[in-house]
Design a protein with these regions (language model features):
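N-terminal, charge-rich interaction modules
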Residues: 5-73
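Catalytic micro-motifs at enzyme active sites that drive phosphoryl/nucleotidyl and oxygen chemistry
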Residues: 56, 95-99, 131-135
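Short, surface-exposed beta-edge/turn micro-motifs
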Residues: 64-67, 104-108, 143-144
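A broadly used, surface-exposed interaction patch
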Residues: 64-95
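"Short basic amphipathic alpha-helical interaction patches in structured regions
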Residues: 82-87, 121-128
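Nucleic-acid nuclease catalytic cores
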Residues: 99-125, 149
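Charged, structured surface patches that assemble and position nucleic-acid processing machinery
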Residues: 125-181
């Protein structure tokens, strides 16, 4: 039989599908710059639990925000991973709305690649970046990250990015979704 997870997606079709799913609760900002592998930034803002992504899980309460970046890289090396992790982190930090009432901000680079080097995968899974503001009175920032390797269908994440990884798996690979190509 054919490997079901095998290349059913190009990076472009995978990203298009993710953007379609994210657009229900994120504001999507397509990237302007063609030289840059970031294809879109998806912004999520929430005040005291107005958005519930699934009826079962209310993920965040109070003032929370997430900046999720979809990054299209054919072959992810450790060097590329570190370069774009740092770029996204710096870009995201500039966007945070920090102050009283702010609870948490997530900066979430999601790497969409055909293939990925093991050292890049390891670095991504170990990545931990967080910061608290004003001794946590003004909340905190956590760096979540996930990776989809389309040639194998493997999805990895750092500890903070697990819910992102679950969402990616559901959107890209759950059998229910196969019908609506």
């Amino acid at each position: 039989g054919v490997n079901q997870l095998g290349m059913q997606y190009t990076r472009e079709t995978a990203i298009a599908r993710l953007i379609k799913s994210f657009s229900s609760c994120y504001d999507i900002h397509p990237a302007e710059d063609d030289r840059n592998p970031i294809t879109a930034r998806c912004d999520f803002f929430e005040h005291s639990g107005r958005y519930v992504i699934s009826k079962k899980a209310e993920l965040w309460t109070a003032d929370n925000e997430e900046f999720l970046y979809l990054i299209n890289i054919p072959h992810l090396t450790c060097e590329l991973y570190e370069k774009w992790r740092d770029y996204v982190h710096a870009d995201g930090m500039e966007r945070l709305h920090i102050g009283p009432g702010h609870m948490s901000s997530f900066i979430t680079p999601v790497f969409i690649c055909d293939t990925c080097e093991e050292d890049a995968r390891r670095a991504l899974k170990k990545c931990r970046i967080s910061k608290s503001f004003h001794f946590s009175l003004h909340g905190w920032m956590d760096h979540h990250t996930a990776l989809v390797e389309l040639s194998t269908g493997q999805i990895d994440a750092n500890p903070g990015g697990r819910h992102t990884a679950k969402f990616l798996k559901k959107v890209l690979y759950s059998s229910r979704m196969k019908g609506d190509k």
